[in-house]
């Protein structure tokens, strides 16, 4: 009988040892106690100490909730800055430029596009020229460069013929002005020799790279160097002409689609409308 009792105790000890080795769940838990209204004794309320996988979704959703409005707000601020910068550089519609110095009132009507602004450049005679030097004159302003292989020379010829026709047949004087977009090669002496081949009345203007870039921005002129190979390169530009009235207001913009006769007729219309 004694050996049987020892065998039973041995089995119990082995079972207890096995249970101790297995132990409880390894998940760390915190135990809170609450009183049960039914049992009248404390019941442990077991909750994980650290959140499991399902609890990580809330912070992610919270971050996404604030990220989208922040991105939209930043984009709106960037667009607003660009608009403010553009308005700051432009001549307001319906008003003359406050920097023109031509005595224009604030109620002066501007028919042309919202472009233009102050500038300081150098003429082919190495003299400083600003927008104030054009006050009281009709000006036909052309942006180009002397190394243009085709469009540039054609535009200068058209400018010369149109201005000459207005002066000889209608006694209307318009000052033709050539503004280079390639100051690196178009020095005052080079421009003087180049423009002399077309018309000695054309005033050539050049300057530093930053000054030319600023004026191009003020007058909304696109230009970009292409096919660069050392000193041999072309400049891609829109080849626009601007008619400026004696108050330094942009009246019209002319593209390459005009011929000399059409250009002179359009110029005469604008000059005559102001003279009436």
Curated annotation (Swiss-Prot):
Residues 110-273 form the Thioredoxin domain. Its main location: mitochondrion. Disruption phenotype: No visible phenotype. It is a single-pass membrane protein. CDD domains: SCO. InterPro entries: SCO1/SenC, Thioredoxin-like_sf. It holds the Pfam family SCO1-SenC. Expressed in the whole plant with highest expression in imbibed seeds and embryos, and the root hair zone. GO terms for cellular component: mitochondrial inner membrane. This is Protein SCO1 homolog 2, mitochondrial. The chain crosses the membrane at residues 66-82. The keyword Chaperone applies. Thought to play a role in cellular copper homeostasis, mitochondrial redox signaling or insertion of copper into the active site of COX. Participates in copper and redox homeostasis. One of its GO terms (biological process) is copper ion homeostasis. It is found in: Mitochondrion inner membrane. It comes from Arabidopsis thaliana. Belongs to the SCO1/2 family. Keywords: Chaperone, Membrane, Mitochondrion, Mitochondrion inner membrane, Transit peptide, Transmembrane, Transmembrane helix. The keyword Transmembrane helix applies. The gene is HCC2. Residues 1-14 form a transit peptide.
């Amino acid at each position: 009988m004694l050996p049987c009792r020892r065998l039973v105790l041995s089995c119990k000890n082995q079972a207890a040892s096995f249970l101790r080795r297995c132990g409880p769940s390894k998940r760390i838990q915190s135990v809170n106690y609450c009183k049960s209204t039914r049992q009248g004794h404390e019941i442990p309320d077991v909750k994980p100490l650290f959140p499991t996988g399902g609890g990580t979704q809330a912070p992610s959703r919270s971050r996404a909730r604030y990220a989208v409005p922040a991105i939209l707000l930043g984009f709106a601020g960037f667009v607003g800055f660009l608009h403010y910068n553009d308005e700051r550089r432009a001549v307001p519609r319906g008003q003359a430029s406050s920097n023109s110095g031509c005595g224009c009132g604030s109620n002066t009507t501007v028919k042309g596009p919202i472009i233009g602004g102050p500038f300081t450049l150098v003429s082919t005679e190495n003299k400083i020229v600003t927008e104030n030097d054009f006050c009281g004159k009709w000006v036909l302003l052309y942006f180009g460069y002397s190394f243009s292989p085709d469009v540039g020379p054609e535009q200068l010829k058209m400018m010369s013929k149109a201005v000459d026709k207005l002066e000889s047949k209608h006694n209307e004087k318009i000052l033709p002005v050539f503004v280079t977009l390639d100051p690196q090669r178009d020095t005052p002496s080079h421009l003087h020799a180049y423009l002399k081949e077309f018309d000695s009345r054309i005033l050539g203007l050049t300057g530093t790279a930053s000054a030319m870039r600023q004026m191009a921005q003020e007058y909304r002129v696109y230009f970009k160097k292409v096919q660069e190979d050392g000193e041999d390169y072309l400049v891609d530009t829109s080849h626009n002409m601007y008619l400026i009235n004696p108050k330094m207001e942009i009246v019209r913009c002319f593209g390459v689609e005009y011929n000399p006769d059409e250009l002179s007729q359009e110029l005469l219309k604008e000059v005559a409308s102001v003279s009436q």
